[in-house]
Amino acid sequence: MTETTGPQTIGSDAIVVGSGVIGSAVAYELARGGRDVLVLDKGAGAGFGSTSASSAVIRFLYSTYDTIATSWEAKFMWEQWAEHLGLDPAEVPLARFHRTGALHLDVPIVPLEPSLERLAAVGVPFTYLGPEEIAARFPHVDVGAYWPNKPITDDAFYADAMGSLGAIYTPDAGYMDDPRLAADNLAEAARRRGARTVYRAEVVAADRVGGVWRLGLADGRSAEAPVVVNAAGPWSGGFNRLAGVGEEFTIGVRPLRQEVHQVTQPAGYGTDEAPGPAVFDIDLGTYMRPGPAGAWVVGGTEPECDPFEWLESPDGVDAHVTRERYDAQVTRAARRLPELRVPNQPSGVVGVYDVADDWTPIYDRTDADGFYVAMGTSGNQFKNAPIAGRFLAAIVSAVEEGHDHDADPVTYVGEHTGLKIDLGAFSRKRPVNESTTRTVLG
């Protein structure tokens, strides 16, 4: 169904609700597969929601084989971004991948040997570094062990280290330098494949009539298609409820307010040409990565000692960074990098995670015919956006052709790695994965 059915109704083969980096990737892959795609987003453009607040880290250490394989396959897409999109960088400004490497510091809640085994099974290059090796190669990094996490207002936070840490070093990790632009690149690539994007288009109603979904918009228009993909980010749970979808889900989602802060790297940590590594530090409750021109991006790994800011709705979230979050996260970063300076004036961005119960995404069909979800991304799926689009395209194609994805989950074979990824790992009906860190690190 490609025709417009009336001046107030927009028809298509598939509607993607949400134009963040995930929704834009889904739209691109559906359009690339030959579908007439309509993208609806309540914002002013692609990536204007929580995507714009992403740290845009590209890393590979997760708690299951399939999630590691997913991130490793996606890495090649980011590295070959222009080719992946079919866009000419001389014609269209493109986000860029920066290879920095990453240190994943030891912590008791992430058993070391299974992590090493999973990385090896996938084929991710890595080295395990002991404390002395870290100190020799990355002298700015303190190797003290401080677990468990403590609030910075507790004197125990400043106590001497109880031991020393090693780390898994993955040299191919890095970051994308502009997450909003990356989403816009995907949206542009989708449009060049025939997709239409409609912004400032808030969905306020959703009903299935016969074999077609009809979505009502706040401005009085409507959109119709046999297929709908919910990629609404922190609004995804609400959109499911609006559509009467989700009763069968064993995995719930909730919006969580988060802050990411920016300071300046310690002198000598790295340069744009030879950047120092990102540091993932559950031991202290933080993650950090370099940025262009000496920037240092600092986020949190959800320490249990800090309050979680769960939201009833992402609408109206306070978009200003707070002194409390800034002090907590940047002080933890400075404990790990003793030469890091902590400016008095907070600087950073606010975003909202769409948190799944086990911090693992849901890429799946639903019990409602024609309704699919790319949700529960939990603040850790920017890195997987290009392949998430391919996952949804594969699931939609299989299910619309009559395949029972619940009984026989689709297997995705990586174009770049040849890895087989069981998409049942991202099922809405999966058991809660008790082995995840229950943090943004997955």
What function would you assign to each model-found segment?
Residues S55-D154, G285-Y287:
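Dinucleotide-binding Rossmann-like beta1-alpha1 core, especially the glycine-rich loop
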Residues Y28-R32, A56-I58, A82, G86-R99, ...:
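Active-site substrate-recognition segment that forms the wall
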Residues R196-W213:
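A conserved short coil-to-beta-strand element within the FAD-binding core of flavoproteins
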Residues V141-D160, V342-I387:
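FAD-binding beta-loop-beta segment adjacent to the flavin cofactor pocket
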